[in-house]
Amino acid sequence: MKVFILGAGKVGRALAAALKKQGIKVTLRPARKGVPTTKIDASIIVLALRDRQLPPVAADLATSGVVPRRAVVVHNAGSLPADVLEPLRGVCAGIAQMHPMISFASLDVFPTLTRGHVHVKGDAEAEKRARTLAKKLHMTPRTFAALDTVGYHAAAGLVANGAAALAAIGVELLAVSGVPRAEAPKMLGPLLRSVADNVEALGFPDALTGPVRRGDAGAIGRQIELLGERLPEALPLFVTSGLAQLPIAERIGDAPKTDLAKVGKVLEKALRGAGARARRASGGKKASSAGRRATSSSPSRLHKRRSRT
């Protein structure tokens, strides 16, 4: 098996490195170099490109004459189906989407692909080879016939990028609580991995832990008070996250409904307070801006400016 990857960004580099470790011959070509001018020597062509690049690149490849008839072409975009490569259908053995549900954050530090899932959907031969490729990377190929790729990609982004955003706030909260900032990510990484393990092994609702699950309104109230004093900008996110946990906690049933109701009241009160503070802050900024405009056009200011001329 020979693989040609067009696109040397985070995904392309990570896939190339992982494939080479498995002894697979890989050619990695940066997208900035454009479509090759000579015949591609590969049975699988992977387009590791941005969504907006796929249609024009597919069209260029289709008319370039460099795609072997025996090759299949796949793309790694999560929100786009195989049909975005439609111009290539007549010049190769098949097209497919091959999206790894993995977070690629760096050009140099690659994520572990093992046990990751890959959504594969397209023409039969392209699906077959994409599945083979995924298995060589020790990943699990999946195909959902009626998949809405936009919703699928939104779910992946919500979890991957939402978790990163939550962790960033967590770093700030640890820092204002006495943890050296450089140490905070090292502490949160294993925590996130344990959450991932729980989600995979237990599913929901059982993967939820913490004071909301236990119905501990007192603990949540103390945390809200601390956030309000030391990191008020994080309070709306903290409260919204807590409210999202409530229905999960209700499904688990560890805490009495009365305790969960108390938790809900504490969170809703905090959310209203955060909203009121935001409105006051916004109003203050508007008033300050209006004041500056009024002052800048006052007679004394105008007189001073004229006197300088």
Q: Which role does the model predict for each range below?
A:
Residues K33-V109:
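Rossmann-like NAD(P)(H) cofactor-binding subdomain of soluble oxidoreductases
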Residues M1-I40:
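NAD(P)+-binding Rossmann beta1-loop-alpha1 motif at the extreme N-terminus of oxidoreductases
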Residues R13, P55-P56, D83, K128, ...:
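Alpha-helical elements of the RecA-like P-loop NTPase motor core of helicases
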Residues K25-T27, V72, G94, T140:
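Conserved beta-strand segments of alpha/beta enzyme cores
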Residues K186-T309:
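NAD(P)-dependent Rossmann-like dehydrogenase/reductase catalytic/cofactor-binding core
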Residues L15, L88, G94, V109-A201:
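Internal alpha-helical scaffold of NAD(P)-dependent oxidoreductase catalytic cores
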